[in-house]
């Protein structure tokens, strides 16, 4: 029986949807990891590869059942050989870590990792990880330990925004700090304190014209000696030299989206995140993090939901591989990770 035109159309739509978010191989940990650091590098043969490191998960019990968070030092390389993508373990970080600032080096020959945290506390070390797994420490340490910050690059500069300096902090750091990766010996330069920067897990990025955006995240306050999160929707956009700053808002509060924001034309893309609607409720009943793919137009500040990711995701690296967005593992709901590495093609009209 011939297919009806409607069924043919439906099958075509399904095929397009499936190719729009083609999964890459899972990371070599079936539990998955949150808070990994990753970058797209150029291999010695000119091919784009993905280097990913660190992260954390709960290999035993869930946290609400008394489980312990375990941090990792693994360095994984994802490379396409004979038409097939495959991960392999290439080395170990000097210390297990997660939730660090990260970026590719200006030459795209290494992954820069700054700060982060592990079971012993927050970190201030900065290192460059090569595709062969070698780790080269930089003398330019952060002025203080910093984890759960936003991070992005602007030219050769790595910019780190907000975060905390210790696990029990009841206030977020209120500075952006900058390291020129082309001149790391010059050290970090920090802004004055600014309330807009005092967030953990903010959405941050820079577009292709050098304009900087920071949005969402969580402010922290003291609740009987423990940090209390306040999810924010503020969106601030600063144009290059002297062109002013605009203030706007996200449609809803949002933190911990896969990031940093990926620039394509005059859009910045983010994936998933935590809207805070279930904060303070029993984590075992959490329905899952966001699946939204959002595009922020840096000319109009319009925020569009342009698609749905195949699975919930938060606290994951967001990378650009060719014309695709890629998430590397991440959290699907509190305490639960996914090993999936998923890709989605940026629509031509948004590039």
Enumerate the language-model features and the residues they cover:
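Kelch-like beta-propeller repeat domains
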Residues: 20-351
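N-terminal secretory signal peptides that target proteins for export/translocation
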Residues: 1-5
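Bacterial N-terminal signal peptides
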Residues: 7-17
């Amino acid at each position: 029986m011939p297919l009806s035109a409607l069924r043919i159309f439906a099958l075509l739509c399904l095929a397009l949807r499936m190719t729009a978010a083609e999964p890459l191989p899972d990371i070599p940990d079936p539990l998955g990891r949150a808070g990994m650091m990753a970058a797209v590098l150029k291999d010695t043969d000119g091919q784009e590869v993905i280097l990913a490191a660190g992260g954390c998960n709960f290999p035993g019990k869930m946290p609400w059942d008394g489980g312990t968070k375990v941090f990792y030092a693994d360095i994984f390389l994802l490379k396409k050989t004979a038409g097939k993508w495959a991960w392999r373990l290439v080395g170990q970080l000097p210390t297990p870590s997660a939730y660090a600032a990260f970026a590719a080096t200006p030459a795209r020959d290494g992954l820069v990792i700054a700060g982060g945290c592990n079971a012993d506390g927050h970190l201030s070390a900065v290192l460059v990880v090569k595709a062969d797994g070698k780790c080269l420490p930089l003398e330019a340490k952060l002025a203080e330990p910093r984890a759960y910050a936003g991070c992005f690059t602007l030219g050769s500069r790595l910019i780190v925004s907000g975060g905390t300096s210790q696990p029990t902090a009841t206030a977020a750091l209120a500075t952006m700090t900058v390291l020129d990766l082309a001149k790391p010996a010059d050290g970090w330069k920090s802004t004055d304190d600014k309330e807009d920067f005092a967030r953990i897990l903010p959405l941050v990025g820079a577009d292709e014209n050098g304009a900087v955006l920071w949005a969402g995240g969580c402010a922290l306050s003291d609740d009987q000696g423990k940090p209390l999160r306040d999810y924010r929707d503020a969106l601030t956009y600063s144009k290059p030299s002297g062109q002013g700053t605009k203030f706007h808002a996200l449609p809803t509060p949002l933190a911990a989206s896969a990031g940093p924001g990926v620039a394509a034309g005059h859009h910045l893309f983010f994936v998933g995140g935590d809207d805070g609607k279930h904060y303070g409720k029993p984590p075992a009943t959490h329905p899952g993090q966001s699946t939204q793919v959002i595009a922020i137009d840096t000319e109009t500040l319009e925020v569009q939901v342009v698609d749905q990711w195949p699975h919930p995701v938060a606290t994951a690296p967001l990378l650009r591989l060719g014309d695709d967005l890629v998430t590397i593992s991440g959290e699907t709901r509190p305490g639960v990770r996914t090993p999936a590495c998923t890709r989605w093609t940026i629509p031509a009209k948004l590039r």
